[in-house]
From Swiss-Prot:
MF GO annotations: transmembrane transporter activity
Membrane topology qualifier: Multi-pass membrane protein
Subcellular location: Membrane
Glycosylated residues (UniProt): 24, 274
GO cellular component labels: membrane
Keywords attached to this entry: Glycoprotein, Ion transport, Membrane, Transmembrane, Transmembrane helix, Transport
Protein name: Solute carrier family 22 member 23
BP GO terms, sorted: monoatomic ion transport
Entry-linked Gene3D superfamilies: MFS general substrate transporter like domains
Organ and tissue specificity: Expressed in many tissues, including brain, spinal cord, kidney, liver, eye, adipose tissue, lung, epididymis, adrenal gland, pineal gland, skeletal muscle, heart, spleen, thymus, ovary, uterus, testis and epididymis.
Intrachain S-S bonds: none
Length: 689
């Protein structure tokens, strides 16, 4: 009885609650944050958890255990998805729906900007001025978003040229694979670049683009590739820097800052007087565009309840693809690259109204303990949604009133280095994103390398819409796969498809060519070579389409996965890392082209090996489907790895979860009682022999 009374007194004094239920390896927000202060070393038996460091006392030392619970904010306020969002009406609230739609609209403008390089910097066919278009030499050109190659035709006797790095091949020998282009100023291109003025055959619907305006051909052709990766480098730096700033000052100020400066730099790009000015301004345009993409992505995720996050994100992707599909018509309407650039940027003027319409992320305000601002925003949202105070069943507002005196607590992404699991998850997703977007160019170049033998692919619009259609099909398939397999299962499936397509393209096609080179007769040699090349071309195109399909899904799903498992306090920083990794993957395309395709095969080999590594690493990720978003780093640490397939009913898992761990906190009481008993009696009162 004395033991029971001591246990009851200890339980009531510490405010001990029953162990929280655990689903898919994560604790509900709030419970995970306070598990360490309430239970000491709670979850020390888990395989992938770390507890937060004790809060510092104002005098400089750590709080005592009796003050740790008082230092932590209310668990109710940390449970945003379970308490605050339902109080505001969830996504059913009319104002929240309006905000979600407002995050979709700019995706159309973003789609225009992301795919503008295909039109502004497309390398047209060109010939010496006065030679006439009838004598045009259609050589290697760069088409599409990924800078793909094609259009190899036979050389002409007249000294005119296409892009300086283009090469020629014998059109009549259709069985020969088009060779890699030779560097400018070497071989047959010496005579083709002796002109001082050129005429251009632009294929993108424009009368003039950047290449034709400043004659970026022959010795100046390398400037086209520099201009291409200036936008990508700006995006990479923008993701990294604006992500950290958005976690510190908020999503709304970064969004407004990015909109204002993209208007300034974007419109100035249209007034460029030389290619150096164009490339420099495109860097800053990409920097600001990254801020818009990142903040809208984070706001969209933070507005939604768990069950709606993925579909709302995919709708935004479809809107951006609509911009990709509309871009050729927009170019044909504008006719001039300067008008096209201005028309792409001007719609961002509408986003200046977002400062008065779009509020700061309430989830971020609550996670960073800015409760004074959060209270004002909650009152504003309840008024907009016509929510009565009586609907506050869980008592969010009374708890908020108690916490108004707290000081804001903001976190930088560098804090993730001190975690145990969170940094691993982010690194895995960064590698996945880098691999997905990097190998996409390998598949695209391989498919466009067969343009000579597939007449459909010789047309710019066929190239462009083929790429866009593959991306659209990938997103549609991703919606179905993620619904049934979850985030981790879907990512694993698409990565396996990417690896298979890459390895089969690299290995199987070479194997076919190897065994076709040892026939018994000359006739069999001709048949074998023809059959080999025909089969190789068909297989190569098929593997390229499958690879582009799967790699696009890998890149997109990696970004979304990161947005879900990264805590709110550092969500923009984590998103910035993964998006920057995607930018590095896309950056490999113009770099390889700048070096005249040297090292392309090694480039493909490296990314193919990365896919195999990623398949293993994906198994280490948690599953975030239908989970509440983690609000702080402690919540993010409790997103632990679980088996890909759940165990059957009645089976005991080898590793117990936190909810199944036994409580042995009363053992010291039993030991104390045992020490007080006489030597001749045991703890249950039985006499010893």
């Amino acid at each position: 009885m004395a033991i029971d009374r001591r246990r009851e007194a200890a339980g009531s004094g510490a405010g001990r609650q029953p162990a929280p239920a655990e689903e898919n390896g994560s604790l509900p927000p709030g419970d995970a944050a306070a598990s360490a202060p309430l239970g000491g070393r709670a979850g020390s038996g888990g395989s992938a958890e770390i507890q937060p460091l004790p809060a510092l006392h104002p005098s400089g030392g750590p709080h005592s255990s009796c003050c740790a619970a008082a230092a932590a904010p209310s668990l109710l306020l940390l449970d945003y998805d379970g308490s605050v969002l339902p109080f505001l009406g969830g996504l059913g609230g009319g104002y929240q729906k309006t905000l979600v739609v407002l995050t979709w609209i700019p995706a159309l403008f973003i789609g225009f900007s992301q795919f503008s390089d295909s039109f502004l910097l497309d390398q047209p066919n060109f010939w010496c001025h006065g030679a006439g278009k009838g004598t045009e030499l259609a050589g290697a050109t760069v088409t599409g978003r990924w800078g793909d190659m094609g259009n190899w035709t036979s050389p002409s006797a007249t000294p005119f040229s296409t892009a300086s790095w283009g090469t020629t091949s014998n059109r009549s020998n259709s069985s020969d694979t088009p060779p890699l282009p030779s560097p400018p100023g070497k071989g047959n291109n010496d005579s083709n670049c002796e002109c001082h003025a050129w005429d251009y055959g632009i294929r993108t619907g424009l009368v003039q683009n950047v290449v034709s305006k400043w004659d970026l051909v022959c010795d100046n052709a390398w400037k086209v590739h520099v201009a291409k990766f200036s936008l990508l480098v700006g995006l990479i730096f923008g993701y990294l820097i604006t992500g950290c700033i958005a976690d510190w000052v908020g999503r709304r100020p970064v969004l407004l800052f990015s909109v204002i400066f993209i208007l300034i730099f974007g419109l100035t790009v249209a007034l460029s007087v030389n290619v150096t000015m164009f490339s420099t301004l495109r860097f800053f345009e990409g920097f600001c565009l990254a801020g818009i993409i990142l903040t809208l992505y984070a706001l969209r995720i933070e507005l939604c309840p768990p069950g709606k996050r993925f579909i709302i994100t995919m709708v935004a992707s479809f809107v951006a693809m609509a911009g990709q599909f509309l871009m050729p018509g927009l170019a044909a309407l504008c006719r001039d690259w300067q008008v096209l650039q201005a028309l792409i940027i001007c719609p961002f003027l509408l986003m200046l109204l977002y400062w008065s319409i779009f509020p700061e992320s309430l989830r971020w305000l609550m996670a960073t303990q800015q409760f004074e601002s959060a209270k004002k925003l909650i009152l504003y949202l309840t008024q907009k949604n016509c929510v009565s105070p009586e609907s506050d069943i869980k008592g969010v507002m009374p708890e908020l009133e108690k916490e108004l005196s707290r000081r804001p607590k903001k976190v930088c992404i560098v804090k993730v280095v001190g975690t145990r699991n969170l940094w691993k998850n982010i690194v895995v997703l960064c590698v996945n994103s880098l691999t997905g977007y990097g190998i996409h160019h390998c598949f695209a170049r391989s498919m466009m390398g067969h343009e000579v033998k597939v007449p459909l692919l010789e047309n710019f619009y066929a190239d462009y819409y083929t790429m866009a259609s593959i991306a659209l099909a990938s997103c549609l398939a991703m919606c179905l796969v993620v619904r049934f397999l979850g985030r981790r299962g879907g990512l694993l499936l698409f990565m396996i498809l990417t690896a298979l397509a890459s390895l089969l393209q690299l290995g199987l096609l070479n194997l076919i060519g190897k065994y076709s080179q040892h026939p018994d007769s000359e006739l069999q040699l001709k048949l074998a070579v023809g059959m080999s090349d025909s089969v190789k071309d068909k297989f190569s195109i098929a593997f390229s389409i499958v690879g582009m399909f799967a790699s696009h899904a890998v890149g997109s799903l990696s970004v979304f996965f990161c947005a879900e498992i990264t805590p709110t306090v550092i969500r923009c920083g984590g998103l910035g890392l993964v998006l920057a990794s995607a930018g590095f993957g896309m950056l490999t395309a113009p770099i390889i082209e700048l070096h005249n395709q040297k090292g392309y095969f090694l480039h493909h080999i490296i990314f193919a090996c990365c896919t195999l590594i990623c398949i293993i690493c994906i198994l280490l990720l948690p599953e975030s489907r239908d989970q509440n978003l983690p609000e702080n780093i402690a919540n993010g640490e409790h997103y632990t790895r679980q088996p890909l397939l759940s165990h059957k009913k009645g089976e005991q898992p080898l590793l117990l979860t936190n909810a199944e761990l036994k409580d042995y906190s009363g053992l010291h009481d039993v030991a104390a009682v045992g020490d007080g008993l006489s030597e001749g009696a045991t703890a249950n009162g039985m006499k010893t022999m």
